[in-house]
Amino acid sequence: MALRFSKTPRLLTLFFSLFFLIPLVSPVNFVVIQPGEGTPLFPKVLQVKSSDIKTYKPNGQVYLLSIWVSTADAKILGAEAVACWVREDCVLFPRSVMYKRNTTTVKEEKKALQEMKASQSDAMSATKNYLKKNFPSVDISKLSDSSLKVSLPNTGGPSGGLIFSIGLIDFFTSEDILQGQKVAGSGTITADGKVGAIGGISEKIIAAKKAGATVLFASRENCGEIPENVSGISVVAISTLEEAMTYLQMVPRSNSRGVSGCTNLGA
């Protein structure tokens, strides 16, 4: 007896294959965010250009933290979005949350570089105000934006303000502020030393740990986004530059890990 098989199963197979395949190879309206790097600022990134300004060799290291964000022009495929979704160190955000409509990568990079430059200027102002109050013997008359050299290609945004300030204060004072520690930080800074929130704090905690930092300063405004189960690093939430410096100078080094300074931890 001859058997004749229906073509329907094959058509259904093809239909369902295309049904699942097409979304995977089609662009989706999302942005991918992943941990970036912890970049050490000493001795090459953060430098003082003027030989007339007295500086001291740091005993320790400070790290600028970054995150990796897909660009405004990037086409994220469905398969890439799924791969990100199943990873713990990858986050998806709607494109409209991260970027304005009709913006471009060039525009966003220019904006980020301007924010970085402004954060360096604010850090210098905050440093001078802190030194004037706490180290009056330090001559701050020659300190200015033009005396500072920062070499950070392909990095932008305002979140380096806090760690720039900590690095500069350690540069200009003879006191052993870092005491051999590896300190990371992420937060905006104002001229009067107030520390503001930044984006991607969870990813930056991962970057700090990979860099080998033992302490990470974060804005108290970010507490709601800091994970409860942080391990392997001390995350210290602060509101001002003064609080960060007090912690470094007054709190004994220990092997404690986790989060301090927050009452409302997030996910």
Please give the residue ranges for each predicted region:
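Peripheral, non-AAA+ core regions of ATP-driven protein-machinery
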Residues: A2-A267
